[in-house]
Amino acid sequence: MAEKDIDKLLSLTDSKYRLSVVIAKRALQLRSGAPSVLPVEQRVRTRNLVTQAMRELATGKLTVGTGLMDENRFHQDYVRQKQAQLQAQLNAERERERD
């Protein structure tokens, strides 16, 4: 990221340490399957999730303290989604076996 973007990110938090924690948490959420909040045309063309998290924060799509889910709630939502997907797959397989 450009130096001006990093300066902007630093201005969003009270310390560089808090900024690094916020970015790390968002990168973990992205790795766990959370969708990007950026429109497709603004997404970073990289697999580096830290860069993507920084871009989301820099563009104002996330704000410190309001745009990040509580870790436990995010994990619970993610587990529920995965369970629903697996149940749907299981139901589809059972339907095919009946036919």
Curated annotation (Swiss-Prot):
Gene Ontology biological-process annotations: DNA-templated transcription
Record-linked InterPro entries: DNA-dir_RNA_pol_omega (IPR003716), Pol_omega/Rpo6/RPB6 (IPR006110), RPB6/omega-like_sf (IPR036161)
Annotated keywords: DNA-directed RNA polymerase, Nucleotidyltransferase, Transcription, Transferase
GO MF annotations, alphabetized: DNA binding; DNA-directed RNA polymerase activity
Pfam families linked to this entry: RNA_pol_Rpb6 (PF01192)
Transcription as UniProt keyword: yes
GO CC annotation: DNA-directed RNA polymerase complex
SUPFAM superfamilies linked: RPB6/omega subunit-like
E.C. no: 2.7.7.6
PANTHER family named among the record's database cross-references: DNA-DIRECTED RNA POLYMERASE SUBUNIT OMEGA
Subunit structure: The RNAP catalytic core consists of 2 alpha, 1 beta, 1 beta' and 1 omega subunit. When a sigma factor is associated with the core the holoenzyme is formed, which can initiate transcription.
Protein family per UniProt: Belongs to the RNA polymerase subunit omega family.
Function: Promotes RNA polymerase assembly. Latches the N- and C-terminal regions of the beta' subunit thereby facilitating its interaction with the beta and alpha subunits.
UniProt name for this protein: DNA-directed RNA polymerase subunit omega
